[in-house]
């Protein structure tokens, strides 16, 4: 019969509440049947029940308060649009899963972005995950690269700048209406990657590799992200084409 193949779906809170009600009912029934104590007498069943239940209720209340405070803190962070925090930026898989789903734009701001091209635009690699940026361009995703001019780079970054410039020039020729790269006229102070509605941003320290610095992942619609995105647009509008250097 079809009735035996049906599944009954019950919300978990109802199951938990029903379990405790049944447990209390069993306790009350057992106390009434297997003891000679009355409910309201001196040290009766009600007193024994309260003596056992009150400490548990106090502990449960304390735990509830702690959880409520923690929930409030998490909610406050969520309202800021924070989705994740990473100790380092050296995880191409984290960026790659969003870039593989990009439909509108990818904006990148950093020191040289050499590692970005190595991870996602390696035309010689047989691995598709190394060509995620190229696949995004093939899907008509707009890509902007914004880095400082070479005169604002330390000597150890000059080679990375040269490689990035060559790759940007090649991509600009292949995707003239989709790809663009520009240079701003000061040292880099932040690293930013925007992939549609996802923004991953962090600081740039002069004497520390950017891949080893922390970042925060937020929604592009959040107030937190808006300042960084406004700064990117301002820097982009004032920057010079990478071909001019």
Cite the ranges covered by each PLM segment:
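Signature of lipid phosphatidyltransferase scaffolds
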Residues: 42, 206-245
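Juxtamembrane interface helix immediately N-terminal to a transmembrane segment
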Residues: 1-22
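Hydrophobic alpha-helical transmembrane segments of multi-pass integral membrane proteins
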Residues: 18-28, 54-57, 106
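HKD (HxKxxxxD) catalytic microenvironment of the phospholipase D
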Residues: 180-220
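HKD-type phospholipase D/PLD-like phosphodiesterase module
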Residues: 148-190
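PLD-like (HKD) phosphodiesterase/transphosphatidyltransferase domain
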Residues: 65-153, 234, 241
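Juxtamembrane "helix-exit" motif on the non-cytosolic side of transmembrane helices
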Residues: 27-38
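Transmembrane alpha-helices and immediately adjacent membrane-cytoplasm interface residues
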Residues: 38-76
